[in-house]
A protein has these predicted regions:
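Conserved catalytic core of sirtuin-type NAD+-dependent deacylases
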Residues: 1-187
Length: 187
């Protein structure tokens, strides 16, 4: 086995149909109706407007969830890899030991202080999609998202140790061992 470490970013997934990081339709260039991506993808937005935050991430997940890994993902499937991509395509390609240094849209954690390392769980996107499969109503979608992520639809306040948060490193967060930063530093 080679001692080569591969580090990848958004360009790797472009051939699978995922826009590049800041391209014309990129993940970080398309915001919500009222907020920029840099405002949406923050812990502060998750706390202040969890319904908007979750709707924004959900719409990205639904758009990308059925895409397939491309030849680069497959080539990297047995390599030592750190990826900045949150799309999960490296996992779908068969790489079970890569480090998703920015997290993964397929996973969630319980909402904790940033220093706390918690177990990862499967994201409840399927549950949300099943409940809203025939509806284009964003208000219904917000309600279902809040319920699936254990956030009160009355208070709209995520609760520490109870609510779920997408396993994604946000702009106003820092690397911790939740994102396997210590392990990445030793590669």
């Amino acid at each position: 086995m080679s001692n080569t470490l591969y580090i990848t970013g958004a360009g790797v997934s472009a051939d699978s149909g995922i826009p590049t990081f800041r391209g014309e339709d990129g993940f970080w260039t398309v915001g919500s109706k009222n907020y920029t991506p840099q405002q949406m993808a923050t812990r502060q937005m998750y706390i202040a407007k969890p319904d908007e935050f979750l709707l924004w991430y959900y719409k990205r997940f639904v758009k990308y969830r059925n895409l397939k890994p491309n030849s680069v993902h497959k080539w990297l499937s047995n390599k030592t890899l750190i990826t900045q991509n949150i799309d999960g395509l490296d996992y779908k390609a068969g790489n079970k030991s890569f480090i998703p240094i920015h997290g993964s849209l397929n996973k969630v954690t319980t909402f904790e202080t940033q220093e706390c390392v918690t177990d990862l769980q499967e994201a409840p996107w399927d549950k949300v999609q099943a409940a809203c499969k025939t509806s284009e109503d964003d208000n219904l979608l917000r309600k279902v998202l809040l319920e699936a992520f254990n956030i009160s639809t009355q208070t709209l306040t995520p609760r520490i140790h109870e609510s779920l948060k997408p396993f994604v490193l946000l702009f106003d967060e820092y690397y911790t061992d939740l994102y396997r930063i210590s392990e990445a530093g030793k590669m």
